[in-house]
Amino acid sequence: MFSLKQPKPSFRSYLLPPQQEDKLNPETKIKKLKAVLLPGEIVVNEVNFVRKCIASDTSQYDLWGKLICTNFKISFITENSVPFQRFHYKNLLLGEHDVPLTCIEQIVVVNDTKRKQKILSHNQKLKFNPTELIIYCKDFRILRFRFDEAGPESAKKVCLALAHYSQPTDLQLLFAFEYVAQMYHKPEYKVNGIDPGGGGDFCQRTPLFETYSDWDREIKRTGASDWRVCSVNEGYMISTCLPEYFVVPSSLADQDLKQYSHAFVGRRMPLWCWNHSNGSALVRMASIKDLLQQRKIGQRVCSGITRSHPLRSDVYKCDLDHNVPSIQDIQAAFSKLRQLCVNEPFDETEEKWLSSLENAQWLEFVRTFLKQAAELAYVLDFSRRSVVLQEEEGRDVSCLVASLVQLMLDPYFRTIVGFQSLIQKEWVMSAYPFLDRCNHLKRSEKESPLFVLFLDCVWQLLQQYPAAFQFTETYLTVLHDSTRISLFGTFLFNSPHQRVQQSTEFAIARNIQLGEEKGLKFPSVWDWSLQFSAKDRALFNNPLYIGKSVPCVQNGAVKSFKRTKNYSSTMRGMPPSVKNGMAIQQDFMPRRNSLILKLKPEILQQVPVIIPSSGFEQYLRDWFTKPADLHGVILPCLHGTHIKLWKLCYLRWTPEAQINHGGFITAFHKISLLASEIELLQSRLRQYRAYPLSTVTSPVGEQNRMFFRPDELHSSNGSLDILTSSFPFSPIGNLCRRSILGTPLSKFINGAKIWLSTETLANED
C-alpha cells in the first residue's frame, strides 16, 4: 500500500547513496514517530502516511510522515530532510514542521474525486472524506498535506479536530492555561531548564510596569519631577482598562481623579507616557463621553498637565479619531496585502504586483502613522509643548502613535530592553486588546493588525537608520511571529485585569493555590531563552549599533537627548554637502557613486526637498540639513521610495522573491564578522593589560554577541550557502505554489552555475 521512493541520482553524483539495511519497514517507522509535547500538551488526533507537499505539481521532493493535532499545534513528523534546505533556525517550542493553532487563518479540505472543497469552521460537519488539507497561516505560510495513502476516516477526524481546536470560543481553552496549570501542579516541569516566566537576560532586565517601583523608576529616568505614580486604581477599583499603577500630574489629587473618571469612555483617565528633557510630556486619554462636562473636565486635566511643565506651556491636543486611519481601514488594507503576498500563481500576478501593492494602501498607512508621530515629535521637541493623544477608547491607535513618538525622541527605546519596556508600557499594561485584535478566538469583526503595523513602522526606521537600533530585522520578525504563539501571557489578553480575572477563575476551577499572587503567572515573551538557543539569540544583536550608557538620574533630572551638531553617525568623513541623505549642494565630493551622479543628473531630482511652508516642515528641513546623532532624535524620511515593503516578514515564504547570496544578510554577515573580530581583539587587549606576562587566550563566552564569528569560518564548510534574502527563515517546505525545483531558477537559487562560460562555448565549437 505504501512505499517510500529511493533517492534519485543528483546533478553532482550519478551514484546512488549507499543504502543501509533497516529492520523496520517504512510503514512501521512512520507509525512509531512521536510528537514532542510541552507540559499540558496532549495529542487530540493523528493520521499516518501523510504526504507534505513541497510544491503543487510534483511529488518527487514531498515528505512522508505523520500529521498530529494537539491542543497547542499542528505537527508534521517525518524522518526525511527537506530538500535544498541548508539552514533553519530552531525554535525550542516548535518543530520544523509545526504551526501553532493560533497562527492558523483558514482551513480548507478538498476531495479530488468528488471535486469538492470546503472551508472548515468550528463544529462543522464534513460529509466527504478529504484527500487534501490546505492550511493558510497568519504569517503568510501555506501548507498542503495529501491523504492519498492515509485512512479516509483518520484523515477526516484529524481535519475536524484541527478545525475545532484552532477556533476556540473561550479564552481559558487557549493552551497557555493548560501549560501554566501543569507548572503549578508539578513544579518539577521545566521547559529547556527554565521555569515559566523567568530567566533570560532580556527578560530579567525588562520592566513589566506591573508594580509601583517600575513606574517610579521611569519617572526618574525621564526627569518628570512634577509627575507622580498614582495607585487609585489598585485592585482595578476605578477602571478595568487601566493598569493598577500609572502616572498623573502631581497637582491632581486622587479624589479629583475618582471624580473625573466617570466622564471618560471606559473610565480611562489621562495616562502619562513619557517626558522630554525640556519638560514637555506625552499623555494619552480616552474621549470624554459627558458632553455637558466635556469642556470643564478637559480644562481641569489640561491645567494639571500645564502646571507640570516648567514653562507652563499650553497643551497640544491631537484627535487620533480624525487624523489617522481607523482600525477597520487598517484591517482592510492588511487583508489586501495578505492576498497579494500569498496569491498564486505568482508569475501571473507579477505584472500588476506593484500597482496591487499600491492599491492595498498598506504602505500609505505606514507613511501616515510615521508622519503623524514625526509631527508630534516636533511639538514635543521644538515647540516644547505637552501633547495629549485623544482617542475614543484610548487603547488602539494611540498605542501605536505614542510608541513611535517615544522611539523617535528617546534612544533608550531603541535598545532591546528599552524597546521591550516600551511595548510593556504602551501596549500590554495600557490594555491594548491583543485577544481581539490578534483574533485568538476567531472573532473576525474585532480583528485589526495594529501591532503588526507598529512593527512595520519600526522596521522602516531601522532601514533608514540601521546604526540607531540595538536590535535587528530578525528580532522584529520573530517578535511578530511570537504574537501567534498561545503560550505567552504578553500577547494573550485584552487587559491586565482580564489576565488576573480569567486566571483566577481558572485557578479556582483547577484547585491551584495562588498564595499572594494576583492570578496565574504566564511565561513572558521577553524570555527569549524559552524559544531560542543563545546562538540563535545572537541574531537579535545589531553589529552596526554603538551603545551609549544609560543617563544617570540625579535629583530627578537626566541628561538631554539633544543631538550634537558636530557628530555624524551615518558615515565617517561624509562630505558636508550630503547629510542624512539630503543633498544640499550640487558639488558632490568624490564618492563611489559619483560617476553615476554625473552620468545621470536626474537622480539629484529624486532627493527629497522639503518646502518650508509650515513650522513642521521648517523643522524637518533644519533637521535633515544637520548631521544626525543617532543617540538623539531621529525622524523618518517619508518621500518617494523611502517607505518600503517589509519583505522578510511578508515574502519570506515566497521562493520567487528570494535572492540567493543576496539581500541585506550578505552585508550583515560581513559586518558581524568585523564586529566580532573587533570585540575579540578588545577582549584580548583588556586581558593583556591585566596580565601582561601571561599567555593571552580567548575568554570563553566573551565574544558571543554576534551570530557570525571569525572562529567559525574555517570550521563550517560552505557556510555562505545558507545566506539568502529570507535568512534565517527557509521558504522550502512551506510552499503551495507551482514547483520550481529542478528548473534553471531552482538551480540558480541553490547556487548552481546555469550560464555557460565563453570557454565552454568555445570548446563546444
From Swiss-Prot:
CDD domains: PH-GRAM_MTMR10, PTP-MTMR10. It comes from the Eukaryota. One of its GO terms (molecular function) is phosphatidylinositol-3-phosphate phosphatase activity. GO terms for cellular component: cytoplasm; membrane. Coiled coil: none annotated. One of its GO terms (biological process) is phosphatidylinositol dephosphorylation. Residues 209-650 form the Myotubularin phosphatase domain. Signal peptide: none annotated. Pfam families: 3-PAP (PF12578), Myotub-related (PF06602). Belongs to the protein-tyrosine phosphatase family. Non-receptor class myotubularin subfamily. This is Myotubularin-related protein 10-A. It comes from Xenopus laevis.
